[in-house]
Amino acid sequence: MSNTCRIVLFYLITCIFTCSASDAPKVRVNSGDIAGGYEYTYSGRKIYSFLGIPYASPPVQNYRFKEPQPVKPWLGTWNATIPGSSCMGPDYESNFKLVGQEDCLYLNVYTPKLPRENTPDDLMDVVVHIHGGAFMSGEGISLGPQYLLDINNFVYVTINYRVGVLGFATTGDNILPANNGMKDQVAALKWIQQNIVA
């Protein structure tokens, strides 16, 4: 391939990535700027998606068995085009193989309209999906927006929360307090309440 073809190909690829990055939907939440993407419902309706948004700090190391801590602000723009990891637990569909990570307190937001398209009189309802799994397994991304937002106009949010031992083990004292997975859910709901109009 000649150098001229390589240069033209390089500029073409650069233009494609630059155009798609500048076309990304952007919002600002309390922790910083977020750039999302697009998805399509079953009937082909285009919706905005913001995936893998942290609603609390990662519950790792000294915070492993503690209640969720506030998310720290980030510099730059958060890439919200990739779902955050599911929380660590068994995958019942693959012979109880352990899946997920400890750094898992993320949520996903799907909406047919961005806030700048809404007037105060045109705000949408918010539906939050908290996955099941007997507090042992599951992930927020398991029920996507493809059907729910096909003809409905509301903001749809899914969350991850700690499951199993990391979310619900307790020693009955302050060393290992109970129900951190439930406290994760409350932290996610508070984050949604404070940031969803972004």
UniProtKB/Swiss-Prot annotation:
* Repressor among keywords: no
Q: List the disulfide bonds.
A: 87-104
Q: Does the keyword RNA-binding apply?
A: no
Record-level Gene Ontology MF annotations: carboxylesterase activity
Record's catalysed reaction(s) = a carboxylic ester + H2O = an alcohol + a carboxylate + H(+)
Q: Which residues form a coiled coil?
A: none
**Keywords, A to Z?**
Disulfide bond, Glycoprotein, Hydrolase, Serine esterase, Signal
Documented EC number(s): 3.1.1.1
Q: What Gene3D superfamilies does this protein map onto?
A: alpha/beta hydrolase
Q: Which residues are glycosylated?
A: 79
Highest taxon of the source? Eukaryota
Residues spanning the signal sequence: 1-21
Tell me which PANTHER family the record gives: CARBOXYLESTERASE
What protein family is recorded?
A: Belongs to the type-B carboxylesterase/lipase family.
Other facts: This esterase confers organophosphate insecticide resistance.
Q: What role does this protein play?
A: Overproduction of nonspecific esterases is a common mechanism of resistance to organophosphate insecticides.
Q: What is this protein called?
A: Esterase SG1
